[in-house]
């Protein structure tokens, strides 16, 4: 490709509204342009990368035995009513009506559409297993689109759906897709981790996310220092620091704490260690509880894991905190002075709190706390659950090593849906005995456009993008110095361009009438892995200059050997 016939569209300055590195560099490198909030046009350079990611994903998903299809981005609303997700998805599901006032949605995912298709097309166990996928535009009406294509409203996604006669078949399909994901991300040259995850609004049982590791990642992932255990912060199991509760050494006393409305103030003003405090959080209760609100009790230095809390049958979903008026009406005190001692409302205790002794907690009277509290002496322990986020150094739940935390960007997710959708939509087949069997489903997604941004977050330097070779927009750049003034430079550049392109190598030939400094900066910004510089001075010495973008090195290569040198770099 010649730059004179290409839309390069690079920018010298970083746009003010670009927060993260990938957004900044995608704009500066001429990969995308914003059309509206969360909506982006992919320019030629960006589209080349997007297509390469797509093709790698397509090849590996094909190799896993899946079959490509293409479903409409517009879906009938009635399908979403069949599964009950029409309300569960909330405002992210964009709804509209056509001219006949028939309701539709813009597809954020396609479980309903694919299940409807399979129930009409597949009738016998002999047609199974079946795995169908598409690479298609999706739309989610994000409340706050940000970070460029990382969290856009419109995005490109690979979504696949497997159908099996039993759970054993589902596990095989799931494992095959897990392996396909690993092969795809390996080929892309990304540092990533598969982690245990919560199934969220998709539903189902087993689920794993694939995270590209990056400091800018929105998600925290926890992994063991001595095993393969890894989970996102929502799913990571928090193990108590000990299995034994120490014997009480203090009597319970009442302490005046008029100015301590937070754990931090309690610790600062009264000298109690933060790990000896507990905080009591009140949330709306579900219909399973004979109360309007329920208390969740965690250690003072820990954070409530809202996903774990919401998954408890006693807690209303979505999670909603009780307000101050409710607390005063039911307990007679406000937040900051509440605790389990004497509490006449149901409560659930975190594992770490269950092994505490001699701890401090609110006394359910404004401006007062109890110190020296002990379970089963001053208050009955009751139900114990995992309620908190893990922290660095926690014991790994696998029993090996401790947990470390890193930031990651979710680029893929795989689910074992089971019969959650197939049962709701009556999707079954006749088995070998002629009996109707509801199908076991799996669901698999890769955010193709998000992979592009994630790769940049992981691969950049002060000069621009440093693409992994497999997904770079071009493999080689040819930069001829003053070719419009030097005929022999032009001839050498044209000859080399013809040779490399004939070999199937993707080359960007910078034939612009520009200053060398401008050309070099653009090539580095775009992130092309290999650059060949051709100039009169180097030709006088019988060589071209070769630059390696990732290694940030340059070397003189004899003119006659340059093609072989490039071939060696690419092997």
From Swiss-Prot:
Record protein name field: Proline--tRNA ligase
CDD domains xref list: ProRS-INS, ProRS_anticodon_short, ProRS_core_prok
Cellular compartment(s): Cytoplasm
Family: Belongs to the class-II aminoacyl-tRNA synthetase family. ProS type 1 subfamily.
UniProt-listed PROSITE patterns: AA_TRNA_LIGASE_II
Residues that span the membrane, as ranges: none
Catalytic activity: tRNA(Pro) + L-proline + ATP = L-prolyl-tRNA(Pro) + AMP + diphosphate
Domain of life: Bacteria
GO molecular function: aminoacyl-tRNA deacylase activity; ATP binding; proline-tRNA ligase activity
Function of the protein: Catalyzes the attachment of proline to tRNA(Pro) in a two-step reaction: proline is first activated by ATP to form Pro-AMP and then transferred to the acceptor end of tRNA(Pro). As ProRS can inadvertently accommodate and process non-cognate amino acids such as alanine and cysteine, to avoid such errors it has two additional distinct editing activities against alanine. One activity is designated as 'pretransfer' editing and involves the tRNA(Pro)-independent hydrolysis of activated Ala-AMP.
The organism of origin for this protein: Aliivibrio fischeri (strain ATCC 700601 / ES114)
SUPFAM superfamilies, A to Z: Class II aaRS ABD-related, Class II aaRS and biotin synthetases, YbaK/ProRS associated domain
HAMAP family according to UniProt: Pro_tRNA_synth_type1
InterPro entries reported in the protein's UniProt record: aa-tRNA-synt_IIb (IPR002314), aa-tRNA-synth_II (IPR006195), aa-tRNA-synth_II/BPL/LPL (IPR045864), Anticodon-bd (IPR004154), Anticodon-bd_dom_sf (IPR036621), Pro-tRNA-ligase_IIa (IPR002316), Pro-tRNA-synth_IIa_bac-type (IPR004500), Pro-tRNA-Synthase_IIa_type1 (IPR023717)
Domain notes: Consists of three domains: the N-terminal catalytic domain, the editing domain and the C-terminal anticodon-binding domain.
Gene name of the encoded protein: proS
First and last residue of the signal peptide: none
Subunit architecture: Homodimer.
Keywords: Aminoacyl-tRNA synthetase, ATP-binding, Cytoplasm, Ligase, Nucleotide-binding, Protein biosynthesis
Source lineage: Bacteria, Pseudomonadati, Pseudomonadota, Gammaproteobacteria, Vibrionales
GO cellular component: cytosol
GO biological process, one term: prolyl-tRNA aminoacylation
EC number annotated for this UniProt entry: 6.1.1.15
Main location: cytoplasm
